[in-house]
Design a protein with these regions (language model features):
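Alpha-helical oligomerization interface recognition
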Residues: 20, 24-61, 76-78, 109-119
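Short microdomains enriched in Cys/His and/or Lys/Arg
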Residues: 219-236
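Short functional micro-motifs and their immediate structural scaffolds
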Residues: 207-213, 227-231
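Protein/peptide-recognition domains central to ubiquitin and immune signaling
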Residues: 203-209, 224, 236
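Alpha-helical protein-protein interaction/assembly modules
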Residues: 53, 73, 86, 90-100, ...
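Short cysteine-rich clusters marking metal-coordination/redox-active sites
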Residues: 199-204, 217-223
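N-terminal BTB/POZ boundary and linker segment
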Residues: 1-40, 67-96, 199-202, 208, ...
Length: 236
């Protein structure tokens, strides 16, 4: 007997992934084309809904061109919107792949995929923090404007800091990703991310966490702007 109710509907929905049946939009990435359906993309993503149902090029041409991600990430994202699951079958590190899945979900505002990729990423980091691609995953996490995965990598790094500092890749990460370093140092001192005050640099407009006393000079971890009055630039 065929599955009934929601389970049966979701099972049937998978059959429309990259299918000609009722397809009314094409998603392209690096020369590859994926057949999709406007109603499915719009239901998952306000970003896609706006692009496909407004006075935009994507709406008139029935085509969405994604340029900032590898086709494997785009394919996995599309598979998810039809099945609510994705798997990494491309030989990429799980940490890196899941971080990129969260990144594309963040960019295109797909809440369900953000939740799923965060869950997978947390598991991957817990088991793979000692691997050489951990710094790569951290760098991807800090490319996003949202802090969604940052607590995961900061906690993992703080718990294993002695072993990580022996790795050249991690040391280079701390030099090239100052926001990660700015989050990690207070955490190592026993101050979790949520307890830190948030500041917005008036020079470069970047936000960062910290604990600044009144009087001494402190520097923005991004642009190195020196100030003694950071209390005037607290933000949320």
């Amino acid at each position: 007997m065929a599955p009934q109710g929601v389970e049966g509907f979701l099972e049937s929905l998978k059959e429309y992934h990259n299918s000609d049946a009722l397809s009314d939009v094409i998603v392209t990435c690096d020369g590859q084309e994926f057949k999709a359906h406007r109603v499915i993309l719009s239901a998952h993503s306000k970003c896609f809904a706006k692009a496909l149902n407004g006075d935009w090029k994507e709406s008139s041409e029935r085509r969405i061109d994604i340029k900032d991600f590898d086709p494997s990430i785009v394919e996995a994202m599309l598979r998810f919107v039809y099945s609510f699951e994705y798997t990494n079958t491309y030989g990429t590190s799980s940490m890196v792949f899941d971080a990129q899945m969260w990144q594309i979900a963040d960019k295109y505002d797909i809440p369900a995929l953000m939740a799923e990729s965060k869950k997978k990423f947390e598991i991957a980091v817990a088991t793979g923090w000692s691997m050489d691609d951990f710094p790569t995953a951290v760098a991807i996490v800090y490319e996003s404007a949202l802090p969604g995965l940052r607590d995961i990598v900061v906690v993992a790094a703080s718990k294993n800091i002695e072993k990580l500092l022996d790795k050249d890749g991690f040391s280079e990460l701390m030099r090239t990703t100052p926001h990660f370093t700015a989050d990690l140092i207070p955490f190592l001192c026993g101050k979790p991310l949520g307890s830190m005050k948030l500041y917005k640099c008036p020079s470069c407009q970047m936000r960062f966490g910290g604990e600044f006393s009144v009087g001494p000079t402190y520097y923005c971890p991004y642009c190195s702007q020196a100030r003694t009055n950071w209390s005037n630039y607290k933000t949320t």
